[in-house]
C-alpha cells in the first residue's frame, strides 16, 4: 500500500515505515502530524485518485528530526566589470516517518 501526498509544495510517494525529508514543518520532535492533502492511494488492485485530493484520506507521520541541508554555493559574475558575488544557502528540513495510511 502506498499513497501520494503533497506537503511543502512538493509531492511524495510514501508507504508505511518509510522515512523521508520534507520542507520544514513547525512541529515538536516525536509528535504525530497528519498530512491531509492526499492525491492518490493504491492498495493492491484498487487505486483511488482525488480531484485534486481524496476526501477523508489522511497519512499519519511522526516527526523524527529537524535539520539543515547541504550548502548550495551561488557565484555571480559579470565579465570585464570586476563584479563578483558569492552567496550560500542551506534549506531547513524536517525528517518524518510514515506511521499509517488511512
From Swiss-Prot:
The keyword Ribosomal protein applies. It comes from the Bacteria. Keywords: Ribonucleoprotein, Ribosomal protein, RNA-binding, rRNA-binding. One of its GO terms (biological process) is translation. GO terms for molecular function: rRNA binding; structural constituent of ribosome. One of its GO terms (cellular component) is ribonucleoprotein complex. InterPro entries: bL21-like (IPR028909), bL21-like_sf (IPR036164), Ribosomal_bL21 (IPR001787), Ribosomal_bL21_CS (IPR018258). This protein binds to 23S rRNA in the presence of protein L20. Part of the 50S ribosomal subunit. Contacts protein L20. Belongs to the bacterial ribosomal protein bL21 family. NCBIfam families: L21. This is Large ribosomal subunit protein bL21. It comes from Neisseria meningitidis serogroup B (strain ATCC BAA-335 / MC58). The lineage of its organism: Bacteria, Pseudomonadati, Pseudomonadota, Betaproteobacteria, Neisseriales.
Amino acid at each position: 500500500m502506498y499513497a501520494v501526498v503533497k506537503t511543502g509544495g512538493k509531492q511524495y510517494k510514501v508507504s508505511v515505515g518509510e522515512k523521508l525529508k520534507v520542507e520544514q514543518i513547525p512541529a515538536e520532535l516525536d509528535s504525530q502530524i497528519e498530512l491531509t492533502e492526499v492525491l492518490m492511494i493504491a492498495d493492491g488492485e484498487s487505486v483511488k485518485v482525488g480531484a485534486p485530493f481524496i476526501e477523508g484520506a489522511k497519512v499519519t507521520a511522526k516527526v523524527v528530526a529537524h535539520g539543515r541541508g547541504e550548502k548550495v554555493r551561488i557565484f555571480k559574475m559579470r565579465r570585464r566589470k570586476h563584479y563578483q558575488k558569492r552567496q550560500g544557502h542551506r534549506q531547513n528540513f524536517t525528517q518524518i516517518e510514515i506511521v499509517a495510511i488511512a
